[in-house]
From Swiss-Prot:
Organism from which the protein derives: Chlorobaculum parvum (strain DSM 263 / NCIMB 8327) (Chlorobium vibrioforme subsp. thiosulfatophilum)
Keyword S-adenosyl-L-methionine on entry: no
Protein's UniProt name: Phosphoglycerate kinase
Protein keywords: ATP-binding, Cytoplasm, Glycolysis, Kinase, Nucleotide-binding, Transferase
Subunit text: Monomer.
Catalytic activity: (2R)-3-phosphoglycerate + ATP = (2R)-3-phospho-glyceroyl phosphate + ADP
Associated pathway: Carbohydrate degradation; glycolysis; pyruvate from D-glyceraldehyde 3-phosphate: step 2/5
EC number: 2.7.2.3
Entries under CDD domains matching the protein: Phosphoglycerate_kinase
Localisation: Cytoplasm
UniProt record similarity statement: Belongs to the phosphoglycerate kinase family.
Biological process according to GO: gluconeogenesis; glycolytic process
Major localization class: cytoplasm
């Protein structure tokens, strides 16, 4: 998917309207608890400033449901950006309207302003053409650098592109397309995918799409128990999607047909309840006790999975191996994270597909030891399912 990027156009003296993803977590005093999304947008932002463009940033934050709500103001993000850049960032009091337009027109080369939360207007998520046109009127160039919302056809990601002559990808989106695209279309082999998470239903399309691409799939997380039940194994009290058992059987058959090795755990860590002080033990998957729930992959599985990962040239990871939020059920997830870091050291391309896996690798302190951590949860998932992302499809080729 070749899209024009910031590097392909001249920015000097131009009003550049950039969609970023500043949907950052805030504490009750409205302090930002994690600024990685703002930091991630810095290369694109700096490029516009250095080239003398006039930068207008827009984003959403949280779910204000189409109403103005000061708790969801982007002011803390503008303040943090100003600190990171070491220069002022003007904060607008809305994202459309005459007053905002006057501020936009007053911008000088190399200056930056931040529009207020797009989702204070219901028209944003409705992809309303008039709202999109009004946003577009503020800029001469549109840049989308918000991969996290690229799977949504909203006014600021899709609608706006109909009303600007130039619509290009920012560096963050370019990097996402490069790594996720390479993984899907041009991977060095062996190519191993690790899929975790609670439910098969959330990962069916990814599994089916990856069967045409990968050599091996390692499965973890609670979704393994639906596979085990499909194979007639005891699952105790583990989470099972009973309405997906037929599907699990067909996925196992499909993997066989396509010559993909679908590897399931051989042992699991079980406990009677999901709590930090529950007594846990390791059991083979052939004899999971009644009343016990599987909450992580066991040591023998960790060893097998680590070996598979270390033998790979390309690794894609999406979804944790267990309830990693609780330390005693986090060993499997952290061991996979460590194996990915070791594989990267050995020259493999390692890609973390956003969402919980990104949180897990950050918790393990290994985010900078892998090739690429995707910034989009739902967007990475849809990309890995082979779906077209409207926010990217709409950009200039």
């Amino acid at each position: 998917m070749q899209k024009k990027t910031l590097s392909d156009i001249s920015l000097q003296g131009k009003r550049v309207l950039m969609r970023v993803d500043f949907n950052v977590p805030l504490d009750q005093d409205r302090n930002i608890t994690d600024d990685k999304r703002i930091v991630g947008a810095l290369p694109s932002i700096r490029k516009v400033i250095e080239e003398g463009g006039r930068l207008i940033l827009m984003s959403h934050l949280g779910r204000p449901k189409g109403k103005v709500n000061p708790a969801f103001s982007l002011a803390p993000a503008a303040k943090r950006l100003s600190e990171l850049l070491g220069m002022p960032v003007t904060m607008a009091n809305d994202c459309i309207g005459t007053e905002v337009m006057q501020e936009v027109l007053a911008l000088q080369d190399g200056e930056v302003m931040m529009l207020e939360n797009l989702r204070f207007h219901p028209e944003e998520e409705a992809n309303d053409p008039d709202f999109a046109r009004e946003l577009a009127s503020m800029g001469e160039i549109y840049v989308n650098d918000a991969f996290g919302t690229a799977h949504r056809a909203h006014a600021s990601t899709e609608g706006i592109t109909h009303y600007v002559p130039t619509a290009v990808a920012g560096y963050l989106i370019e990097k996402e397309l490069r790594y996720l695209g390479t993984a899907l279309n041009d991977a060095k082999r062996p190519f191993v995918a690790i899929l975790g998470g609670a439910k098969i239903s959330g990962k069916i399309d990814v599994l089916e799409h990856l069967f045409d691409k990968v050599d091996t799939v390692l499965v973890g997380g609670a979704m393994v128990f639906t596979f085990f039940k499909a194979q007639g194994l005891p699952v105790g009290n583990s989470l099972v999607e009973d309405n997906k058992i037929e599907l699990a059987i067909s996925l196992l058959e499909k993997a066989k047909e396509k010559g993909v090795r679908l590897i399931l755990p051989e042992d699991v860590v079980v406990a009677a309840e999901i709590s930090a002080d529950a007594a846990s033990r390791v059991e083979p998957v052939t004899t999971i006790s009644d009343g016990m729930s599987g909450l992580d992959i066991g040591p023998a599985t960790i060893e097998t999975y680590a070996k598979e990962i270390l033998g790979a040239k390309t690794v894609l990871w999406n979804g944790p191996m267990g309830v990693f939020e609780i330390d005693q059920f986090a060993k499997g997830t952290f061991a996979v994270a460590q194996a990915l870091a070791d594989a990267t050291d050995a020259g493999a391309i390692t890609i973390i597909g956003g969402g919980d896996s990104a949180a897990a690798i950050a918790k393990a302190g290994l985010s900078d030891k892998v090739t690429h951590v995707s910034t989009g949860g739902g967007a990475s998932l849809e990309f890995l399912e082979g779906k077209e992302l409207p926010g990217i499809a709409a950009l200039n080729d």
